[in-house]
Amino acid sequence: MTETGELPSDLAGMQRYVDAWIRERGRYWTPLSQFARLAEEVGELGRELNFRFGDKPRAAKDEPGSVTDELGDIFFIVLLLANDLKIDLAGALAATVQKYGQRAGS
């Protein structure tokens, strides 16, 4: 993929991969800047979903976007933010799934 090698398929490996990638190219942005970028990307995803499935027609000047690309952008920034804040996303996801499972069982 890049000089960092192939993208791992496990979440912890993805976090390490993105950490190596960002360090090769510079540094992490501040957490607040990362959050602002995340909000921007979520907005772009929302815009594309609204064009595709909502009531807002796409204007002639609006190029079709890619839901896949927008989700990839969001995931990349989530990985960056988690790394910067020293959060194990696999552990966070496991806790969230357990929490939702308990809610569904109630």
How would you name each of these model-derived features?
Residues 1-71, 75-106:
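Flexible "arm" and connector segments at domain edges
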